[in-house]
């Protein structure tokens, strides 16, 4: 209970500290299904919903979008992998004036686990297509995962998550946009095939031109089939 009050207090302080600038708060639940085709090749399907609960000094709950995504991943060895993905974002049904988006993604990932902490670096290139424009986004993500009990994450145990991401978006219709994201959270291994994760992510959106502050509360269930 003390931890809950502390988290709520931090959220309120964050909201108050940036209230004079653009600030938005989101809740983002998702479910992720993954299965291995072979020892080196796997598929991943994700359904994700985004709800806005705070928008510039106003608390109001509205669904913003729904995402459907698929990734195919090929492991090159124990440390390196490549992947391609496709995603469709439904926004027109929820927000007036917004457009649905088709997104293609290419990914390279490098991960190591020298001791109890796993380190992961990920590069992504994305092509984001709407009815009015096409943009290209480039992403670098550094993430850590660490077991809370012992050298490995066993069934019934918790683990901590942290990540830092830098993004650049370019298009013919607007100036380059830079974004910074930082997140931290905790996960639990409920069984051999199910994990739950709760992550708080803070984003600085377009911080070189039109700075916006965004706070995401992300909850996810990962299921291995």
Describe every region a protein language model picked out:
Residues 48-56, 87-95, 126-132, 166-172, ...:
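Sequence/structural signature of outer-membrane beta-barrel proteins
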Residues 43-45, 82-84, 119-123, 138-140, ...:
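Transmembrane beta-strands of outer-membrane beta-barrel proteins
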Residues 25-27, 62-66, 100-104, 134-140, ...:
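Residues that define the transmembrane beta-barrel architecture of outer-membrane proteins
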Residues 108, 213-225:
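Outer-membrane beta-barrel "beta-signal"
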Residues 20-76, 81:
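Start-of-domain marker
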Residues 39-41, 79, 113-119, 148-158, ...:
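Short loop/turn motifs that connect adjacent beta-strands in outer-membrane beta-barrel proteins
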Residues 1-25, 225:
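Bacterial Sec-dependent N-terminal signal peptides
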Residues 35, 74, 88, 110-112, ...:
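Residue-level signature of outer-membrane beta-barrel architecture
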């Amino acid at each position: 209970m003390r931890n809950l009050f502390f988290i709520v207090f931090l959220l309120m302080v964050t909201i108050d500290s940036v209230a004079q600038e653009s600030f938005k708060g989101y809740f983002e639940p998702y479910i992720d299904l993954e299965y291995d085709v072979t020892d080196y090749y796997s598929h991943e399907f994700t359904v994700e919903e985004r709800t806005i609960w705070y928008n510039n000094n106003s608390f109001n709950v509205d669904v913003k979008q729904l995402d459907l995504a698929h990734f195919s991943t090929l492991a090159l060895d124990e440390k390196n992998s490549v992947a391609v993905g496709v995603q469709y974002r439904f926004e027109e049904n929820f927000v007036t004036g917004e457009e649905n988006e088709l997104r293609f993604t290419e990914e390279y990932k490098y991960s190591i686990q020298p001791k109890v902490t796993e380190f992961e670096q990920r590069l992504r290139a994305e092509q984001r297509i709407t009815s009015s424009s096409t943009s290209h986004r480039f992403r670098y993500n550094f993430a850590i995962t660490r077991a809370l009990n012992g050298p490995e994450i066993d069934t019934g145990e918790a683990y901590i998550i942290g990540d830092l991401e830098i993004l650049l978006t370019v298009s013919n219709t607007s100036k380059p946009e830079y974004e910074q994201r930082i997140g931290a959270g905790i996960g639990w291994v409920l069984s051999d095939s199910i994990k739950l994760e709760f992550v708080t992510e803070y984003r600085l959106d377009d911080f070189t031109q039109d700075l916006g502050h965004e706070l995401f509360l992300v909850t996810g269930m990962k299921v291995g089939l």
